[in-house]
Amino acid sequence: TVVVTISSLSASAETSLLFIGNSFTYAYGSAAKFYRADSVTDLNNEGIGGVPALFKSFADQAGLDYDVYLETRGGSGLDFHLENKLGVIGRRPWDRVVMHGFSTLDSSNPNNPAVLIDTTAQMSNFLQELNPDVEVFLTATWSRADLVYQSDSPWNGTPIEQMAIDVRAGYDAAA
């Protein structure tokens, strides 16, 4: 008589990493949006790969063991994720979280970092309630030419790098 025992081995990675963001996270309008979507877990089940899948690919090549997740919504800031996605985000504690807000700091009041500062603190507190040891990384977005050259933009008539400087200053204040 031969007895075969099959044991269940945990397939989870050493470190969980969640990306929270918008189209800047998944590269809207590019092939990267769906790049290697099967290598990451899209918490919204939209089949997105994007920057999280690129990170996963680089991590794998470097021999780093990450379970990579993403929770994204195009055109949104952290305020959207706080108001609508805490149930999804809070399903588990995270080891590391990479997040960013709206590309102009505030969709209703461009170049004003107040909402970003407030929502970064709120999201960080929520994530720390899930895991007191979570590492939270805030990544700034980049300049958008379509917003620098519009007449109603706070960056109208300035060099494109001014938007980058202002956005970075907002993220520095939020950090």
Regions found by a protein language model. Name each.
Residues 16-18, 97:
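Conserved beta-strand elements of the Class I
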Residues 21-26:
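Short polar catalytic/cofactor-binding loops
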Residues 11-15:
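Boundary at the C-terminal end of the N-terminal hydrophobic targeting segment
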